[in-house]
Amino acid sequence: MKILIVVDMQHDFIDGVLGTPEAVAIVPKVKEKIEQYRDDPNGVVIYTADTHHENYLNTMEGKKLPIPHCIHPSHGWMIPEDLYILNSPIIMKNTFGAENLPNYLTSIERICEKDKGSIEAIEIIGLCTDICVISNVMIAKSCYPEVPIIVDSSCCAGVTPESHKNALEAMKMCQIEIV
């Protein structure tokens, strides 16, 4: 099976309080990639969602980035309908990396192995390349060192174009396949 992890494609990161023109620009390609996996009999799509609460400004992240965002269950927290496949798992996380991502991947592998085989590849796309994407890529690589981990750079955007490029280079150095 091939797994697509869609990282934090939420309103606040696309066109909300932390949105950027680059984030808006990748939406059509992200949608196309999600549809490819949805239509592939061996494809599985899972999502992460940055998830904060009213106390966000009191957290370590909130003190360093004092912009409330992805407050559950606000509009900004939501994944746009046209990017979400109904009934697909959403891993809610309150920090950059989804600490329970390994458990989700193991569960998906157990549930789907009979029909779709073992994990052949994990592709990771979304926002922001230089924060949450790279964090989740490293978690996946640590858990599945022998499985190809792929990042489609055209389906990612960073806080800035320069930080996006730097994150892609850092992932390349960690044997991540950048396409």
Q: What label would you give each PLM region?
A:
Residues 98-99, 156-160:
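Short, small-residue-enriched loops and turns at beta-alpha junctions
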Residues 57-59, 101-104, 135-136, 162-163:
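Short, well-ordered secondary-structure micro-motifs
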Residues 12, 51-52, 96, 128-130:
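Short glycine-rich anion-binding loops that position phosphate/pyrophosphate groups of nucleotides
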